[in-house]
A protein has these predicted regions:
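Short aromatic/basic micro-patch
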Residues: 46, 106, 182-184
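Active-site/catalytic core of tyrosine-dependent DNA strand-transfer enzymes
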Residues: 29, 109-110, 153, 159-167, ...
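N-terminal core-binding DNA-recognition domain of tyrosine site-specific recombinases/integrases
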Residues: 3-4, 8, 12-84, 101
Length: 186
């Protein structure tokens, strides 16, 4: 079976039923821009470690290569799971480009205080206090609602996230089950 046939007939319909919209948007983009042009017309059993290594070596950025490989790997693993492919090249030693070192910028305590003081009395003050002080992911901070704050108990309930996907807002459950949590208010 050609990879493109599997994508159109089996894998993409599975994705539309089981994955978050933001994940689907990323998968579709990686498929259209990177995976399909190289492997779409190939039989799934013809895709080899050597071909994948050569393909990955031609990417301009490590991030794009890693995302495209993640999508190709997901496709091939689903085909194996559904008994449509016998050889699992995804478990072999695929050579991914080195990830550039990422050092997040973290506000110092002094910078946090200055930021919070600048928002004193602002309608977003409570939101900013929670987001800064509780270490929320960006989408978790965007998803906060007043009902998530329990002033009597002094806790904040992280119940959802808010993402901007394909030009519209999407409310999503927390990224992982451990992300659904209750935090002490500052």
């Amino acid at each position: 079976m050609l990879l493109q046939e599997f994508w159109n007939g089996r894998f993409w319909p599975y994705c539309t039923r089981n994955l978050r919209e933001s994940t689907r948007v990323g998968y579709e983009s990686a498929w259209r821009l990177h995976v399909m042009p190289c492997f779409g017309g190939m039989g799934m059993d013809a895709i080899s470690v050597e071909l994948v290594d050569k393909w990955l070596a031609n990417f301009d950025t490590a991030g794009a290569a890693r995302k495209a490989w993640a999508v190709l790997r997901a496709i091939l693993r689903r085909a194996i799971r559904w008994n449509l492919l016998d050889v699992d090249i995804t478990r072999r030693d695929i050579q991914l480009p080195a990830k550039p070192h990422y050092e997040p910028q973290i506000l110092t305590i002094r910078q946090q205080r200055a930021l919070l003081q600048g928002f004193y009395g602002h309608p977003l003050e409570a939101w900013l206090i929670c987001a800064v002080s509780c270490g929320l992911r960006t989408e978790e901070g965007y998803g906060l609602e007043w009902s998530d704050i329990d002033l009597r108990s002094g806790v904040l309930h992280v119940e959802r996230g808010l993402q901007w996907v394909s030009g519209h807002e999407v409310t999503v459950p927390p990224k992982t089950e451990l992300s659904r949590r209750t935090l002490p208010l500052p």
